[in-house]
Amino acid sequence: MNTARNARTARVAYSGAIHSATPLDGGSTARLRLADGRSVAEADVVWLPPFAVGSIIALGLNYADHVKELAKELTVGSQDEPLVFLKGPNSLIGHQGATRRPAGVAFMHYECELAVVIGRSAKGVQAADAMAHVAGYTVCNDYAVRDHLENWYRPNLRVKNRDGGTVLGPWLVDAAAVPDPHALQLRTWVNGKLIQQGSTAHMVHRIPALIEYLSSFMTLQAGDVVLTGTPEGVVNVDEGDEVVTEIDGIGRLVNHIVGDAVFGR
């Protein structure tokens, strides 16, 4: 994976093909420059996840304040070891995409997360060397349907593997452009109201430790992505809501909540 030429890149569908794209105006998504030199408007493209995604590895309960928030509902145990789980490829969508709220659901919430993108193979990597395996970062909004959550340590597939429930983008930001990924502010707005606010400084298990842990029992490949968890401040979202998740220096990710009727079933 090579992001060296541009600190900020995207992938979009335009005119029947998939293109790499960069912003024409700083970090704005309003107009894009395609790899072939054409300039296009955001309204004319479909945003995809900003890189070819391999394995999707997600963290649960990786912010202490979020643990306290959820412990009011369920028993949460020790965090000596990261709580990790895998997500399916059909859960992925890009910036400005639509996420379905299933009929009859009582509680579905967003999760603003820093997504760490692996740039080269990692197996048996020590924490001190782990950051050399990171290509870059993007924003993730990792939805959860809490109705089906019975045990945080055995996440039900219906909670975290819904089609279109893992929103990535808009940009892949080169690791060299992010001096300290543990000093970033995360924010979420629902219909223009700021609801969630936190900092990556409060991760329980930091990125080098996560890469060391994961690579101790599995090989991480270029394109794999590690979703590092969310801080406190999650609330229910409903059909018609606009959800915006933002991480300083990484991007501002827009997503829309829709009902079953939009999908024809």
Label each residue range with its predicted role:
Residues N2, D25, V45, P49-P50, ...:
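Catalytic-pocket segment enriched in acidic/His residues
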Residues L83-R101, K123, G164-W171, E232-V235:
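Short catalytic-site patches enriched in acidic/histidine residues
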Residues N62, E111, A115-S121, V125-N141:
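RNA pseudouridine synthases
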Residues S55, E81-L83, H95-T99, A106-L114, ...:
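Generic beta-strand structural signal
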Residues W47-L48, K72-L74, T99-M108, A122-D129, ...:
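A generic local secondary-structure boundary/capping motif
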